[in-house]
Curated annotation (Swiss-Prot):
Membrane topology: Multi-pass membrane protein
Biological process according to GO: transmembrane transport
Protein name, per record: sn-glycerol-3-phosphate transport system permease protein UgpA
Pfam families, A to Z: BPD_transp_1
Entries under InterPro entries matching the protein: MetI-like (IPR000515), MetI-like_sf (IPR035906), UgpAE/MalFG_permease (IPR050809)
Entry annotated with the keyword Transmembrane helix: yes
Assigned GO CC terms: plasma membrane
Top-level division of the source organism's lineage: Bacteria
Subcellular location: Cell inner membrane
CDD domains xref list: TM_PBP2
PROSITE patterns: ABC_TM1
Amino acid sequence: MQRVVFPNKILPYLLVAPQIVLTIVFFFWPASQALYQSVIREDPFGLKSGFVGFANFSAVLSEANYLNSLKVTVIFSVLTALLAMGVALLLATAADRVVRGKTFYRTLLIWPYAVAPAVAGMLWLFMFNPAMGTFAYMLRRNGFHWDPLLNGNHAMILIVVAAAWKQISYNFLFFVAGLQAIPKSLIEAAAIDGARGTRRFWTIIFPLLAPTTFFLLVVNTVYAFFDTFGIIHSVTGGGPARATETLVYKVYNDGFVNLNLGSSAAQSVILMAIVIGLTAFQFRFVEKRVHYG
């Protein structure tokens, strides 16, 4: 391997300086502020503050609303990840078999990823709006009373569908890349041995997609935890009756709406610990490679 030699010793540091500055400004500084705010308590006007240690964490972990948000987040994350990955794998498998127009279909399937989360949420809200939504009208015609504004289960279904639709394109790209990396000789050998399409998929293709699937499982879980705020805020606002209030949305409610900065900061630190744990878990196990032979 040829070693890269820079003409100036300062040049490498200058090249990485913008990224270092961005990391300090947008990660280390906010993280340090969250850690500081999580161990102090301020008065409602922000004039006085005092050190309280882990009292904010103790109050958060014993709060019924926080435990409810944790349950909602787990349910929402599992459903979103399974739906987004399942549909993406189905579409990737179908697109991989297309001979003519393959690039065109793949481009169409990638478009939803470019849609902003709030826009994606409003799109699905309009379609399932109880008063004027097309899909809501179809459900009523079939005797199903759809009302995500009052029914918590309906609201959960709506944000899961919207969040999964937004993430399908991302998963689709990785699954297509994983399918293309599988040696065709293995599939052809299985076909010669008499294995049908479904059996070839479950015994050969899907096991070889294990690294990609595991990687996407972690990514989709992190996505559902942290990147769906815009969808929830635009569709349900955490309601009805906190039925869709995830951990991230509760941080927003406590910090920016109720101005309880100590509790909000403690929740942020807990979320930061969760994402660090998920990332470490991913780096620990995703390095396992599949060897073709």
